[in-house]
Amino acid sequence: MFSNQYIQQRIHKANSLREEGKNPYKNGLKRSLTNAAFLEKYAYVKGLEEPKDKEKCESIVGRVKLLRLMGKACFIKIEDESAILQAYVSQNELNDEFKSLKKHLEVGDIVLVKGFPFATKTGELSVHALEFHILSKTIVPLPEKFHGLSDIELRYRQRYLDLIVNPSVKDVFKKRSLIVSSVRKFFETEGFLEVETPMMHPIPGGANARPFITYHNALEIERYLRIAPELYLKRLIVGGFEAVFEINRNFRNEGMDHSHNPEFTMIEFYWAYHTYEDLIELSKRLFDYLLKTLNLPSKIIYNDMEVDFNQTSVISYLDALETIGGISKDILEKEDRLLAYLLEQSIKVEPDLTYGKLLAEAFDHFVEHQLINPTFVTQYPIEISPLARRNDSNPNIADRFELFIAGKEIANGFSELNDPLDQLERFKNQVAEKEKGDEEAQYMDEDYVWALAHGMPPTAGQGIGIDRLVMLLTGAKSIKDVILFPAMRPVKNDFNVESEE
């Protein structure tokens, strides 16, 4: 692993430090200020007649980003999480320590500098070193002298390296953290209680997806990584909680692309004595809150598309297929005509697909990508909504919506099915679909039906994909850009290292 000549040179320098009685991985030294705090606190120094303040002494830490050696002195750019700060190190103050520094210090090393604030002739606020310590010797050279890491695969596989050399990546994940904390704060302010439900399920449920399977040795049974927390959260509504939410991971054993990762983060929330129409209004308030918190305008650009949050609309599923998808009503209303139309459009469909699934195929191909501004699509076919409440006026549709923004589904919500007998029949239909070969059809969950039989109040529930939400609000084009360690196909790592020169 460490046979590369450039790594060997650095290992030799680490061993040389040990021979001098210095630990190249020193511990226990503390900084007194972050780099940003130093720059703010001592900004006044640049205005002094003699731009220095020897009465002050601070310790700063960070990674060496740039090193300029000039005879008996050197300038070092040091980066911590907050900012980059320059240090000036001179042989006059450090004597033999300066010689050791020149011999051993390299770009990438993590250091501590203790000294007083001063400004250079060019007016740059810096720290004049009185002490200098290498805290962690880097034995692998960093790429391109911090000019950036452009290999996309390497960025995702070695995210630590990506974070070191690409500051904008760190900014994305700071924004992600702010988005998640803002979502949490919003729901707490709205009166929702945050809860935690199991990550391993005896029966996978809550969504149509293929699960990951594991094995519990003590119980001697298979367990499934959860594909959704929905059925457990609704059990809590049965138990008497009236407004709950959970932010956590879901796992779906499916394909990967720029908007899908098998391990992803969602918020799901359930609201007793409310309907899906209430969720639509709640979602609008959530986005208003997030835009304000992130200081984003109502119009944002995502993937070269202008998304206007002031142009939010609501449209029914069939109306969207007709007015946006361009499919006539007489085709949409007849299953055989719709199948023929899809085949004419060279869309590959299974011959035994139900009417509801044919509509879904048409929607995916002709409508979804055109929904740029926030669009709540309502009145979904009941056949593709096995957990949603049946509409009172039309039993063929569900009281359900999905929110689309920039051509992608962002949220899914509905008035919950709380009739245990209806739910049991729908589970039976799902089992029949699974027996026909539909691996994503849901399993029978008799325990959940039994819970419903104890009475669940009228409830509305919704899920929002956090990763896609972060993509939208940060402009990221791939879900891998907003997940710190995305799923990647394993490769043999040859640990190539190129010269820093």
UniProtKB/Swiss-Prot annotation:
Keywords noted in UniProt: Aminoacyl-tRNA synthetase, ATP-binding, Cytoplasm, Ligase, Magnesium, Metal-binding, Nucleotide-binding, Protein biosynthesis
Cofactor note: Binds 3 Mg(2+) ions per subunit.
Catalytic activity: tRNA(Lys) + L-lysine + ATP = L-lysyl-tRNA(Lys) + AMP + diphosphate
SUPFAM superfamilies given in the database record: Class II aaRS and biotin synthetases, Nucleic acid-binding proteins
Binding positions for Mg(2+) 1 per the UniProt entry: E402, E409
Cellular component aspect of the GO annotation: cytosol
Catalytic activity, EC: 6.1.1.6
Alphabetized InterPro entries for the sequence: Aa-tRNA-synt_II, aa-tRNA-synth_II, aa-tRNA-synth_II/BPL/LPL, Lys-tRNA-ligase_II, Lys-tRNA-ligase_II_N, Lys-tRNA-synth_II_C, NA-bd_OB-fold, NA-bd_OB_tRNA
Record flagged with keyword Aminoacyl-tRNA synthetase: yes
Positions of Mg(2+) 2 binding: E409
Cofactor: Mg(2+)
Record GO terms (molecular function): ATP binding; lysine-tRNA ligase activity; magnesium ion binding; tRNA binding
Cell location: Cytoplasm
Principal EC category: ligase
CDD domains, alphabetized: LysRS_core, LysRS_N
BP-aspect Gene Ontology terms: lysyl-tRNA aminoacylation
UniProt record similarity statement: Belongs to the class-II aminoacyl-tRNA synthetase family.
PANTHER family the UniProt entry points to: LYSINE--TRNA LIGASE, CHLOROPLASTIC_MITOCHONDRIAL, LYSYL-TRNA SYNTHETASE
Assembly and oligomerization: Homodimer.
Descriptive protein name: Lysine--tRNA ligase
